[in-house]
Every structure is written in C-alpha cells, then in structure tokens.
Design a protein with these regions (language model features):
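Terminal presequence/propeptide segments associated with secretion/organelle targeting
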Residues: 25-376
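Bacterial N-terminal signal peptides
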Residues: 14-24
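Bacterial N-terminal signal peptides that target proteins for export
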Residues: 3-15
Length: 376
C-alpha cells in the first residue's frame, strides 16, 4: 500500500506539471460584461464544438433579462441563429456552457431552454455567477428551482457510455431514477489518450467511471483562468462539493433528434478534477487528481471457460459509488457470459483500505437464479 500511495503522489506531481504547461496556453485574460450592462437588442456570438475539437461560432441576440429566473439569480434571454443552429435544429444537448460574447466581453454561458420549442431561444447564466463557484470550499444549501412549473429546463447534458452494454445502462437508470440519466452508447476516438488544453468553447467531460469502461457527461467550457475552469452554466447533478474526474472530450457529430439534438462524443484523457456542481454550473481545476476507488473485476464463465478482467476507477460518493461499482460488475458479467437465463454464480470480493492500516475484508457467496443469473 505504501508503494500505491507513493505512486499516487508521483502521479499527481506529474499531472500537475504537465497541465501547468497546458493551462498557460489556454488561459487568456478576458473582460466580463456585467449583467447590468446587457441590453435588449445587443448582438454577439457564442462558441462551441460541433465536430472533433474545432471551435465554431454562431450569432446571439439579447432579448431581455429574466430577474431571479435561475437557481443562482438572474438569467439573460437570448435568440440563437446562423448555419450551425439551422443544421443542428437549435441548441443541442452538450452545448450547455457555450460562452457568449458581446463587444469582445464574456457575458456568460448558454444554459437553459424552453420546453416544446425549436430551441432557437434560451437563457444565459451570467459569468459573474459562475466564477463564484471557485469560492465554494464546502457543500452548502442552494435555493430550490422548480423547472417543471416554469417550463424552463436546463439544456440536457449527454451521458456518454463507453464499454457498457445497453442492459447495464438500463439497470443503472433504474437504480438512480431521480437523476433521469439518458446514457448514449459511444466509442473511443483515436487520440483519446492524448491530453489537450481547454479553452472557452472546448468540450469537456465530467466522468464517474474511468478505465476499461467510461461513463461521464459532456458539456462546454465557458471560461478558463489559469488552472481553473467553469462550464455547463447549470447544475449537472447538483451534488455541491464533489469530485468528478475532469476529461477532454471529442465530438463525433451532432445527432438530430425529434425530441432534442445532442452531441455524440467520446471521453478522452483525464486532465484534472471537477470539484463543484451547483446552480450556476460546474467548476474544476487542471492537474489535480480527483480521488477515486480502483476496482478490478474478473469474471469466468465455467460453461465456455471464457475469462475477462476489467479495471476501472470510480468516483468517491456515498450515493453514486455503490451503484456505479455494481453497474460495472453487472456489465462485465453480461459481456463475459454473453447470455440471459438461469444459472449459479460464485461471488468473491475483497476490500482494501486506502491507507493500508486495516486488514483486507474478503467475502464469498453463492447465488442461484432460475430467471437471470446476471442480475442476481
């Protein structure tokens, strides 16, 4: 365990050194436009990624200010246009966090839309509210925001799943119904293991699971200041002080959907941690490794003698960790035995303490099911 702890310290040092260089290229001094300067009729542009890592722009027109319209205060009503918006059918899932500029000044992030519209109109979260996330060291209460009653809804954040099958994702959704997860099956891009610097308009992922299986949400970076970033413009899960893994993201394309268009992307290299998930967005830091729980899963099918071993890292969270770990195991079982139906399973697990001061906890059990041993 001492070797593991030394390796983790070494990894954090290397990661911080590497991304010190990346951040120096991505951070540029930007002037903010305060909300009291924003007037109806003003025009500007927004930035986002529609394919690959290339940042594109599209026009924005300010329609007004919605006082106390959002969970963190005022929101800015705007109309979006241009060839990109026409091509995508409006603001797509994954565009949340797209920075909006007027007269060269950063106004805020595209964050909310109206239900039952073509998504040409939406709300912008002011940048002043987003950068306050950097001053939240601990979990705190946030006033409730009833999106259902107002029909104003956060632009959905696509949940990209790589290495998981559809059955496992349906199982996950059933266990975490309150979050209304809508996972999208995806694959890896060719350069996913390469770290890229983030800038305003880049795609970014907040990941739960990393390794042989990956699961996380893709959105857009609003602002970068040295090693710190803010993104999304609205809460992801609203978990307050949290530790998600921060990753690069690659966008394959924007998929047009009758319900809502969405960015189809892959989760790339780990580049830092997301430590705030609150009303005005998410915030994180380059080069800082989020604590994670390493899990090794080995499954052997006695009928076919097929064996698979998967290794993942899962975020530390009292509510999410057990479900994410169980989903990862369930997925590995599904893919190894490659069938549904009855059977018998012998299950062994070993838990090791992080600091190595406690003895390993090992348990064995046997399960039988006539219907579906996978879910047992």
């Amino acid at each position: 365990m001492n070797k593991i702890r030394k390796f983790r310290r070494f990894a954090r040092t290397v990661m911080a050194a590497a991304f010190c260089c990346l951040a120096s290229f991505s951070a540029m001094a930007e002037t903010f436009m305060q909300i009291n300067e924003v007037q109806p009729g003003m025009t500007g542009y927004a930035k986002t990624v529609a394919h690959g890592r290339d940042i594109e722009t599209f026009p924005v027109e300010i329609l007004g200010i919605m006082k106390n319209g959002g969970p963190s205060g005022d929101l800015i009503l705007a109309r979006f246009s241009g060839p990109l918006i026409e091509e995508t059918g409006g603001i797509a899932q994954g565009m949340s966090g797209s920075p909006v500029y007027i007269d060269g000044k950063l106004v805020g992030a595209i964050a909310y839309g109206w239900s039952f519209t073509k998504s040409r109109m939406g709300m912008i979260t002011p940048i002043a509210d987003m950068v306050k996330l950097w001053n939240n060291p601990t979990r705190e209460e946030i006033p409730d925001f009833n999106a259902r009653e107002t029909q104003l809804i956060p632009i959905a954040t696509p949940l990209m799943a790589s290495g998981f099958d559809g059955v496992s994702m349906e199982w996950l959704k059933g266990k975490l119904k309150s979050y209304n997860f809508q996972p999208v099956d995806t694959a890896s891009a060719g350069d996913d293991d390469t770290a890229f610097p983030l800038q305003a308009g880049s795609s970014v992922a907040a990941a739960f699971v990393d390794g042989d299986m990956r699961l996380g949400a893709i959105g857009t970076v609003t602002y970068v200041d040295d090693n710190n970033i803010v993104a999304f413009g609205h809460p992801f899960l609203k978990r307050g002080s949290i530790n998600y893994f921060m990753h690069n993201a690659y966008i394959f394309t924007i998929v047009n959907n009758l319900d809502s268009s969405f960015k189809l992307g892959s989760i790339g290299a780990e580049i830092g941690k997301i430590d705030q998930d609150r009303g005005s967005g998410i915030a994180g830091e380059y080069g800082m490794t989020a604590p994670g729980i390493p899990v090794t899963i080995t499954v052997t099918d006695r009928d076919t003698q097929r064996l698979q071993t998967k290794r993942v890292k899962i975020i530390e969270d009292n509510e999410l960790t057990p479900v994410l770990a169980a989903t990862s195991v369930y997925n590995t079982v599904n893919k190894t035995i490659d069938r549904r139906g009855g059977g018998t399973a012998t299950f062994t697990y070993k838990i090791r303490s992080a600091d190595g001061t406690e003895k390993d906890i090992t348990r064995h059990n046997m399960y039988y099911s006539e219907d579906n041993i996978n879910e047992k």
